[in-house]
Amino acid sequence: MNNFLLDFLALGAVLSGILVITSKNPVISVLFLISVFVNVAGYLVLLGVGFIGISYLIVYIGAVTVLFLFVIMMLNLQLTELSAVGNEYTKNLPLATIIGSLLLFELVSVVPSFDGFYQLNSTTTIFKFLGVGILNWFNSLSLGVGNTFAFAEVNQTFNTFAADTQFANFLQIQSIGQVLYTNGALWLIVSSLILLLAMVGPITLSMNKKDSSPANQVNTVNRLVK
């Protein structure tokens, strides 16, 4: 039953992702994007990575998609304008097919512990590989979160030279925090600077640069007085 739910959620996420980019109505597209995040969150929870699954619901659905809806409503797009350019989607199908084939080839070539194309013989095999193989690969990394399954304590194996991690057991969220603020502290600071630039950059680019010279200010005051 658990494997069936994993396959169902993975298939739902893939189909919702396809509908996100094929829907002509931006509001409907955002709703399908919410469906993608819900399916992925459920998939992660069933795999045992409950904290990251709940974070998907809080961060992506609670903040990102709401921001998308706010921007779409603020732009006030007309459905007639969207339907007028809807026929142009079919012109890019050959290019989309080529890019999709290249991405599939890269996925099969780069992802480890994959023996060949012949394993893609069923939907269950594909999603089982994507769900278990990739997760085990990330768990084997030195900066990974190990076997951090929900509702179970895990041994801390990230910093083997620290004495306090040799005799302590950590929950999933404690394990992630241990890695994030010790081994990945530098990358956390770098990512925060990148997010700061991403926030300040659009504001700076969209600012209306006006002439603030004293002469211009005097002319503005004179126009207001008149």
Curated annotation (Swiss-Prot):
Function noted in UniProt: Core subunit of the mitochondrial membrane respiratory chain NADH dehydrogenase (Complex I) that is believed to belong to the minimal assembly required for catalysis. Complex I functions in the transfer of electrons from NADH to the respiratory chain. The immediate electron acceptor for the enzyme is believed to be ubiquinone.
GO molecular function, one term: NADH dehydrogenase (ubiquinone) activity
Family: Belongs to the complex I subunit 6 family.
Transmembrane segments: 1-21, 27-47, 52-72, 94-114, 126-146, 185-205
Name of the featured protein: NADH-ubiquinone oxidoreductase chain 6
Domain of life: Eukaryota
InterPro entries linked: NADH_UbQ/plastoQ_OxRdtase_su6, Nuo/plastoQ_OxRdtase_6_NuoJ
Catalytic activity, EC: 7.1.1.2
CC terms in the record's Gene Ontology section: mitochondrial inner membrane
Chemical reaction(s) catalysed: a ubiquinone + NADH + 5 H(+)(in) = a ubiquinol + NAD(+) + 4 H(+)(out)
Entry membrane topology: Multi-pass membrane protein
Signal peptide feature range: none
Compartments where found: Mitochondrion inner membrane
A Pfam match: Oxidored_q3
Disulfide bonds: none
Keywords on record: Electron transport, Membrane, Mitochondrion, Mitochondrion inner membrane, NAD, Respiratory chain, Translocase, Transmembrane, Transmembrane helix, Transport, Ubiquinone
